Amino acid sequence: TAIISSLILFIIFFCSFFVELITPYNPFDPSSLSLMEAFTPPSWTEDGLSKFILGTDGQGRDMLSTILYGSRISLIVGFSAIIFSLILGVGLGLTAGYFGGKYEMFVMRLTDVQLTVPSILMALLVDGIARGLISREMHDEMAIYVLIFAIGISEWPQFARVSRAATLVEKNKDYVSASTIIGVSNLVIMFKHILPNILRPILVIGTIG
């Protein structure tokens, strides 16, 4: 099962990032528009054309090419957003769990507040703020980056809560106490000793995300 799943993921990634080798059509190229071939059915139907395997849309663009080019953007945005939220959430959760006190209380209350807001609503809110702060032309140019930030900022609380809980368990173990006694800095203890031991649940959440 794992091998089959990995093979399917490899095919998806290959087709998405090497789409130019698979199909000659670029849906973003205005010259690819052909209203005469609009709404062409898939190639296996009676009126289908062999050059359009999945048919065309209302503007005559090849549907297979549109899906593949779109999947590339979706994968880039998805992975970048998860990495951003992972770095932010783990950083806050790890430091909150390690130092504790008012800082931990502040971070956890912040996660509680944000978890009351649906992720999609938070992403739309961030995008709306971005539209108000920058010009429309700049927003169009930075649309992908704004989307990555909007999704990432809405997903970090789950990483923060898990990493904080795991850090609370790890920081009371003997290897952390030994490192503290011999004078190892807090930064080294957190990111070199504790972080590798709490990565497993974090990576599981990241994979699901």
Predicted regions and their residues:
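Generic hydrophobic transmembrane alpha-helix motif, especially the helices
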Residues: I53, F84, L88-G89, G97-Y103, ...
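Transmembrane alpha-helices
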Residues: R72-L88, L187-G209
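Hydrophobic/aromatic positions within or immediately flanking transmembrane alpha-helices
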Residues: S5, L121, L147-I148, S177, ...
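Gly/Trp-centered helix-boundary motif
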Residues: T1-V90, T95, K102, T116, ...
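ABC ATPase nucleotide-binding domain helical subdomain, centered on the C-loop/LSGGQ "ABC signature"
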Residues: N172-Y175
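Short helix-to-coil transition segments within interhelical loops
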Residues: T56-R61, Y98-F99, A178-V188, K192-P196
